[in-house]
Amino acid sequence: RGLVGSEMCIRDSINRLNFWLFQYFFVLLPYQSVRFNRKRKFIMKIIVSEEIESVCPTFVGACVEANVVNTPYCQELWDEIHALGEKYKETLTTESLKEMSGIAATRKVYRACGKDPSRYRPASEALIRRMLQGKELYQRDTLVDLVNLASIAYGYSIGGFDADKFEGDTLTLGVGKAGEPYEGIGRGMINIEGLPVYRDKTGGVGTPTSDNERTKMSIDTTHLMVLINGYDGDEQHVRENAEYIIELLKKYCQSDGGSYFIYK
């Protein structure tokens, strides 16, 4: 009887082990894989409103998404920023930079929407202007610095976001309304009436002048979304800017670069 009882205990143990192995390999692991892939393949739907189409019918944007590792500082990235700054000092002035295609087109859209582009400068113009004045760009963290480099390199105003902070699954590009609440990063509440603005389910998240505190990137950001605003309608240039960002992410943010798509 003792031998039979021992055999039964062994069988029970084997059955339990088989049960848990089955749960692990055929239930838990596939679930974890699906959950990871859903996050990695997450893509927001982006709608360009009739408001924007009416003032800029040739608008073309690019959305870059990637899994990333952010760091406080990257010397190699800043070497690239400084090199580009020196190049611009030799080739541009604070007036001629306004003629860069992406900047000129964004300023034109501002005027069409009723906003003074000299008071609310597009971010790309403000960054390059600061360089030309001999001022150092503000250093934040690697993701912020990288997006700034991509913006000044191509002249487009680019929004960088922590994609996990968006509400809902759709972003709509429209025009800011009077009294619409919007907290710019490091700027407090700003007046976005007449500014092109991306909105999620909750409200505004990004304009060509300033992105919103609510969805900003941080040192803990692992899921990045970047929006390139091509108000000049140059799709090839916008694509090149997106591919440039992907290469920077591979070099400086331990990323495989993610992917991008064009929207109009």
Predicted regions and their residues:
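Generic short amphipathic/hydrophobic targeting helices enriched at N-termini
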Residues: 4, 30, 39-43
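Single conserved hydrophobic/aromatic residue that forms the stacking wall/gate
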Residues: 1-12
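Short, positively charged and aromatic/hydrophobic N-terminal segments
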Residues: 14, 28-31, 35
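A detector of low-complexity, intrinsically disordered, Ser/Thr/Gly/Pro/Ala-rich segments
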Residues: 12, 16, 41-42
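Charge-biased, low-complexity intrinsically disordered regions
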Residues: 42-264
